[in-house]
Amino acid sequence: MLFSEQYPGLEKKFGMVWRFAPMADPLVAEWHCRDLDSRPTQRELAAVQDWQQSQKTFHIMRDNKYHGASIVGCCFGMKIEITRNFPQMKKMFEAMLDYVKLKWFKGLDQNALHAVVWPEAQKDMVAHDSYLCHHFASDFNRPWPTQRISGPDFSAPEVLNFVGSNGGKITLANHGECPKQCRPKNHPDWLLC
């Protein structure tokens, strides 16, 4: 049976939850959810590789002071191992489809992630968080493995200098310093962590 045949009417569901379909696909071992307009960066690659080396199932990235959701729809990933957690992931996807039934509004995907995935993710995750590590305090929080690219005056020469960026940039002027508790212990000097 084709995957799409298992979920008739999926095309009528809130479109932003379609991107979570790999949770219920037995052929997927690992996946990363991004917005189409969010270009990958070296910073993101370093964070993903850090997570891949861990034994944690979920990867959450909050790389902007406005990434205030427990799980930002454009910045997370999962390891799905058939023998360990595929049935659980499939049930989560189906619960998210049920959650969005008859609803359609901006942010609904993140509400569904918070209601369905967050209770499990916070037990088994790596979370790279540059500004809100104190808000989502967890033993699984980690500072970003690389410093945010910035010029000598802390301006941002690169437009896409945060994960999930669709063209914006983070500078000291528009975001301020990242909190000290979100910086690597060996790099308290990273003002734009």
Question: Where is each model-derived feature located?
Answer:
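Active-site-proximal specificity loops/subdomain of glycosyltransferases
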Residues: 1-31, 39
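Conserved glycosyltransferase catalytic-site signature
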Residues: 16, 20, 45, 106-111
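Conserved donor-nucleotide/metal-binding helix-loop-beta segment in metal-dependent transferases, i.e.
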Residues: 11, 38-72
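Alpha-helical recognition domains of nuclear gene-regulatory proteins
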Residues: 30, 50, 115-116
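Secondary-structure boundary elements
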Residues: 25-29, 53-57, 84
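Catalytic metal- and UDP-sugar-binding loop of GT-A-like glycosyltransferases, i.e.
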Residues: 34
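Catalytic core and acceptor-binding pocket of nucleotide-sugar-dependent glycosyltransferases
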Residues: 57-193
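Intrinsic disorder
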Residues: 30, 42, 103-107
